[in-house]
């Protein structure tokens, strides 16, 4: 079933010049870019996006990281896009991600793990509403 999902190419991906390499992996799996924008976000957007983590100990450094430089937000569409993106991204901790995944091949640390992908169709809908209202 064709679904939409939100992907963030985090500031480390932009800083390291990996945007094209990462996008090509999604496109090679048949996912279509529906919307894409590079921007720098403020703490309010980060807090809205990561609402379930705001009170957790690890969150302040994560917020500083995602607000510390430009990122690329995009909506991808395709068959089972949520699951496909999560498989392509690999394990959240890049040191544990399998080779052949985006994080396994390019990630340098757990926090600077290059990408975010929605974890469910419901999360995708909520996150797309934050990043691309009206889409």
Swiss-Prot record:
It is found in: Cytoplasm. GO terms for molecular function: ATP binding; metal ion binding; nucleoside diphosphate kinase activity. The keyword Magnesium applies. It catalyses: a 2'-deoxyribonucleoside 5'-diphosphate + ATP = a 2'-deoxyribonucleoside 5'-triphosphate + ADP; a ribonucleoside 5'-diphosphate + ATP = a ribonucleoside 5'-triphosphate + ADP. One of its GO terms (cellular component) is cytoplasm. ATP binds at residues 10, 58, 86, 92, 103, 113. Its EC number is 2.7.4.6. The active site is at residue 116. Homotetramer. This is Nucleoside diphosphate kinase. It comes from Nocardioides sp. (strain ATCC BAA-499 / JS614). The gene is ndk.
């Amino acid at each position: 079933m064709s679904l939409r999902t939100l992907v963030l190419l985090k500031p480390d991906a932009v800083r390291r010049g990996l945007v094209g390499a990462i996008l090509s992996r999604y496109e090679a799996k048949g996912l279509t870019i529906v919307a894409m924008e590079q921007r720098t976000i403020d703490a309010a957007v980060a807090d809205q996006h990561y609402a379930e983590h705001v009170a957790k100990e690890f969150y302040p450094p994560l917020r500083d990281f995602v607000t510390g430089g430009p990122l690329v937000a995009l909506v991808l569409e395709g068959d089972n896009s949520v699951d496909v993106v999560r498989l392509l991204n690999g394990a959240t901790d890049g040191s544990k991600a399998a080779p052949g995944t985006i994080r396994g091949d390019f990630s340098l640390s757990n926090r600077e793990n290059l990408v975010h992908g929605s974890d469910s169709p419901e999360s995708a809908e909520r996150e797309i509403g934050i990043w691309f209202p009206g889409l």
